[in-house]
Amino acid sequence: MTAIVDIIGREILDSRGNPTVEVDVVLEDGSVGRAAVPSGASTGAHEAVELRDGDKRRYLGKGVQKAVEAINDEIYEALSDMSVQDQVQIDQILIELDGTENKSRLGANAILGVSLACAKAAAISYDMPLYRYVGGTSARTLPVPMMNIVNGGVHADNPIDFQEFMIMPVGAPSFAEALRCGSEIFHTLKGELKKAGHNTNVGDEGGFAPNLPSADAALDFVMAAIGKAGYTAGEDVMLALDCAATEFFKDGKYVYEGENKSRSRSEQAKYLADLVARYPICSIEDGMSEDDMDGWKELTDLIGHKCQLVGDDLFVTNVTRLEDGIRNGRANSILIKVNQIGTLTETLAAVEMAYKAGYTAVMSHRSGETEDSTIADLAVATNCGQIKTGSLARSDRTAKYNQLLRIEQELDAQAKYAGRAALKALA
């Protein structure tokens, strides 16, 4: 009854209006699992390869027909009649079928779409929610949301060099209350920005993209909004940053074009340490460039005991890179992006490795998203305690928050909101 009878790939649009892959996996019992694949703007050099057509006459070269063809032909033939019960075997077949280290032949977008759709079809066939199917009976932790309310870097057309300024409602008693807190701060911030004469257009992830001169200026606005909304920064709400430092690391220096400043590796580490000392910042993602290994070690030694240091471009959800980071004392947390590695099995392996090493894990969206809410279920399935899925605007972001609300309601008394315990530096 759980045998795969059809796999249907198609080209759809993501939240930026670019093509992406969607996959339906149809089972013998009539169950259908559907998954849509996200896409990043600031991508790590070591990520699995997203296959694009490259035909400039169609979608400016960003079409994904080659990936769709691979799904409908080669991948379908390899998986047809298989049972979806064995996710590990399915993912191993997909990896071997591709035959490359970075999934560049079939495309990580094709492989991931099929991998996730198989898991969803299996969950439907067993009449189980996805978080329960993947995580078992222990899956009950609702994550603290990292809400990206000010956008900069490649996510926005403004002078701010850091990519994301986020709030984390760690003091809320439930996920629903955390979401309310974030929404109230988001709308208060909009009013404060308007009052100061800034535009309130939003970036790719739904956060505001004002013309502010520096990270300090952005943090000051966020701090003011937290207070005006009736919350206490450092108690009810903590701050988090995604520097996306790889994007402004040039010739061995961190070049802040918006501030007209350049910082050495040591100066970058000290600058971030100074921000942590002056603001209630509990998490910094990609504070150093993806290949600045000495910089990562210096930053971790400097503030790793009091701040979560998340490796995104550094680790790209890859167990080999994560293992190297753990062994050499770089970062203390990993960002989990399913499309960076390309299969559900490899994603879960990265989370497990992080846990065993005492690292935290943060489930994450990409800047190019869809209405697919799989990562909400995966955050609960893995009990990772943190999710990064954008602002309180744009339905591609709120789709994940709304799914978490449903899960919390469904779990009822079993639901546990991670709160401050999600961050080892605060626990």
Swiss-Prot record:
Q: What Gene3D superfamilies does UniProt report for this protein, alphabetically?
A: Enolase-like C-terminal domain (3.20.20.120), Enolase-like, N-terminal domain (3.30.390.10)
Q: Which cofactor does it need?
A: Mg(2+)
The molecular function terms in GO held by this entry are: magnesium ion binding; phosphopyruvate hydratase activity
User: CDD domains, alphabetically?
Assistant: enolase
* Chief subcellular location: cytoplasm
Instruction: Give the InterPro entries listed for this entry.
Output: Enolase (IPR000941), Enolase-like_C_sf (IPR036849), Enolase-like_N (IPR029017), Enolase_C (IPR020810), Enolase_CS (IPR020809), Enolase_N (IPR020811)
Cite the binding residues for Mg(2+): 242, 285, 312
Subcellular compartments: Cytoplasm; Secreted; Cell surface
Coiled-coil zones: none
SMART domains reported in the protein's UniProt record = Enolase_C, Enolase_N
Q: Which residues form the signal peptide?
A: none
Pfam families per record: Enolase_C, Enolase_N
Q: Which domain of life is it from?
A: Bacteria
Residue numbers annotated as active site = 205, 337
Q: Does the keyword Cytoplasm apply?
A: yes
Q: Which GO terms describe its cellular component?
A: cell surface; extracellular region; phosphopyruvate hydratase complex
The free-text note explaining how the cofactor binds reads: Binds a second Mg(2+) ion via substrate during catalysis.
Binding positions for (2R)-2-phosphoglycerate per the UniProt entry: 163, 337, 366-367, 388
Report the top EC class in one word. lyase
Q: Which pathway does the UniProt entry assign to this protein?
A: Carbohydrate degradation; glycolysis; pyruvate from D-glyceraldehyde 3-phosphate: step 4/5
Family statement drawn from the similarity comment of this UniProt entry = Belongs to the enolase family.
NCBIfam families linked to this entry: eno
What is this protein's function?
Answer: Catalyzes the reversible conversion of 2-phosphoglycerate (2-PG) into phosphoenolpyruvate (PEP). It is essential for the degradation of carbohydrates via glycolysis.
Q: What is this protein called?
A: Enolase
Name of the gene encoding the protein in the UniProt record = eno
